């Protein structure tokens, strides 16, 4: 089939004529699914009225399918239900004792991670127009407070303490290729700048000159093997590679002289070590002498946990959990979803493991009335290829949040169609698109869209659209899912 551009597909979706008068929702959705791209895919769809559960449309609604990032609906709902919307994550700086009269601190200075995903330049609360600030800004605030406590010399090490959760960096089912990049960053209770750095690779200005490599924040979390060649007349080809868990970053390829930098966001292998090095840098910039080194402290799976003790020199509380969940769902932030899940498991079960978190997700789905045979999850973000959810499970969850009195809040955390988050570029030309609030999901051959349609609470519809196994362009399949969502919205307005 002839490939279509993303723009043309979206324009096609926006310019469709309104539903024919008198046609049922079944007939209107059937017309959408008659498209060639739809026929070569597996669809799981359910639309139910939130108020009474009346089924408006269903197709393979109880078949477990790969949900991709629609999994985040479950992990964020779980955090809100178990921890509460006002829950805050705390990062502390501890020392064995207070500094002496000369400002000397004897022993190690410990930066204790509390699972806060906001130790970065990201703006909270979420704003679609916000520009990110200093990636080390929150750590700088902690460093300032340490200096205000009179610390001038540290005889020991700077320790990045990530022992709140066991060190299990990646959930089951994550692709090895994802682990190199920011969206597949390792999960740690001490996370700074989303455990990633901005890598900039700029070819030399003349034949034979080496490429310049820069990191932001300005740290050196990798041993760089740079074999990129600058060659006149060459076609630009710059490759970046890192084996999972390795601190060796390979930069290779060829590029003509000059030209702009190639930019990638690369995950760091040891988030707590990265945090310790960043904190040491900030303290030194403020004139603090550090006799020791920066190092990380982790807890092996199965090892017991005890709350770190010491004199608290500084602390930082995160914004409320609801605002963190908003970021997860609006921009589909994988690492943050996993962090919310681990912290929920830590608080509820006393073990911040992926498995304990997944078991809590299953418990919530069963509380919502979902059938156990219709879901099987492996992570909190949906990056795992092993996760399964049915459309019925997701709509049950969406209705359950309403029943718990969290419906309006949960709905507000989702992308607004045609306006923000991962739906900012979709539903163009639909006048009342903002009445659709939904979470997107995307993996290779997987598309998902689940959420709410309609502004009137009495007529609002919870829906889930899961698409698996397609070979058509992603934009074409998403446009079909969007058309179905619009038809569901129209039904809610009748």
PLM features: residue spans?
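Short active-site loop at a secondary-structure junction
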Residues: 58-78, 325
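Residue-level preference for non-acidic, small/hydrophobic
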Residues: 53, 72-79, 158, 190, ...
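Bacterial N-terminal signal peptides
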Residues: 7-17
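A short, well-structured edge-of-sheet supersecondary motif
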Residues: 34-59, 295
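Small-residue-rich helix-loop
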Residues: 42, 56-58, 146, 331, ...
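Positively charged n-region of N-terminal signal peptides that target proteins for export
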Residues: 1-5
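Conserved serine DD-peptidase/penicillin-binding transpeptidase domain
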Residues: 23-35, 81-373, 456-457, 479-483, ...
